[in-house]
Every structure is written in C-alpha cells, then in structure tokens.
From Swiss-Prot:
Residues 1-21 have a biased composition (Basic and acidic residues). This is Small ribosomal subunit protein uS15. It comes from Desulforamulus reducens (strain ATCC BAA-1160 / DSM 100696 / MI-1) (Desulfotomaculum reducens). One of its GO terms (cellular component) is cytosolic small ribosomal subunit. InterPro entries: Ribosomal_uS15, Ribosomal_uS15_bac-type, uS15_NS1_RNA-bd_sf. Part of the 30S ribosomal subunit. Forms a bridge to the 50S subunit in the 70S ribosome, contacting the 23S rRNA. Pfam families: Ribosomal_S15. Residues 1-23 are annotated as: Disordered. One of its GO terms (biological process) is translation.
Amino acid sequence: MALSPEKKNEIIENFKTHEGDTGSPEVQIALLTERINQLTMHLKSFKKDHHSRRGLLKMVGQRRALLNYLRDRNFDRYRTILEKLGLRK
C-alpha cells in the first residue's frame, strides 16, 4: 500500500524543515504515520491478512526508532511532531 505521489508530496511540504528536505526525521515519521494509518484501515477489513500485519509492526517499530532518535537529539522538535501528528506520548 504505497502512498500516492500527490499525498506524499503534500506530507513532505507540511513537515519539511528546509527546502528540498525529504529525509529529515519529521518527514520520515509523517510518511510512516500515513502508511500506518492506511494499513490499519486495510487490516480492519481483512483481519486474516497476517502478512500485512507483520509489515505494519515493522513500520511501527521503525517510526518508534525515529521518534526515539528525535527525542534524544532535539526534544522541542520531538514534541512538535507528536502534537502535529496527534500521536500519544
């Protein structure tokens, strides 16, 4: 379940830290969050899709690692991204 190019560009525009930014932790976290949300909706309809469930767990772990990295490096940016995405913490 890939993101459409339009949706991906929209997320990058909203979370970039500088011009041409596609790889900052904020952008990566936002893209993963959108993919996680899409896959969660898919799994609500297809409960036995265990292959996709494993991919979801990998994405959640990757997002968690990026959030931990951001928390350790710059706590203000960490709090900002949590608020913008509405993630618990």
